[in-house]
Amino acid sequence: FANMPYAALPRTPRPLRNEDYLGDVLVQKARQRRNFKFVYKRKIALPQQAGPSADPMYNRLIYLQAEDDLISTGNLLVTSEEHVAELAALSIAVAMPDEGFPRSVDALVNIDVPEFIPPNWRHTKSAEEWAQLILGGASRVGANAPDADLDDLQLKLIHVASQHPYYGAHWFYCHRVNDQPEIVAAMPRDLVIGFNADGMHILDAGEGRAALATFGYADIYRWGGSSSQFSLIIWDAEVESTFELILTTAQAADMAAIILDYINAIMAATGVN
């Protein structure tokens, strides 16, 4: 396995199939003597199902996923310093409901404030500089208000995440294999492929995660793979023809499954048989 071209690629959580039960997966992994962990993530996130629930536990789980995508992993890139400070303030307020929001730069520094900053922004300023910005952000979003409601703060962060074009996406790290046609040759070798309600997103795996292309599921004509490769036949509207994208990945089966799951979910939600 170590000699495989995909061996060094980061692996992302594998979405469970609809028919999988956690207990069965737990038993299977235990028998295989493999290290594993479960990661909570809503598998299918459609716009028409994005509203808050009356169940506070459900909202809490959705919040944790949004916080992870925005702050812990940075999968949803935040593009402005102002928004970074506001999101960090919300995250801190939710994490410290009993202690209350820190009221000074020193108090914020003492809670290791960089841990509340998205990875691509974390090292651009000192902890003291971020703390000063977060104090301002907290005032703008009400995170430091004495009567701040925890549920409202969570919903504010969820709202920010849900407006992102990549919200709800499942991400897979891949190497590009083929060099033709031109649209493929222009892509870097290392890619991050995401699938959400809007379709397939192709990003540069380098720092900054530059967006390269997005294709709706109607543009993905065929897909499939083996244990080490995944290929897609995609319609390119600009040249009015299809092209093949061949990728090296250890998660071909996971990618194939989430495409099908999203297509089925979209068809069911729109009443298409």
Predicted regions and their residues:
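Small/flexible residues
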Residues: 13-16, 44, 124
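N-terminal recruitment modules of adaptor/scaffold proteins
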Residues: 67-69, 74, 82-83, 87-273
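Eukaryotic mixed-charge, acidic/polar low-complexity intrinsically disordered regions
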Residues: 1-34
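Short beta-strand element of the conserved SAM-dependent methyltransferase core
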Residues: 1, 39-40, 108, 232
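Short amphipathic alpha-helical surface micro-motifs
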Residues: 18-23, 27, 44-45, 53, ...
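Long, low-complexity, serine/proline/glycine-rich intrinsically disordered regulatory regions
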Residues: 30-51, 55-70, 79-90
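Intrinsically disordered, low-complexity segments enriched in small/polar residues
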Residues: 4, 19, 38, 164-165, ...
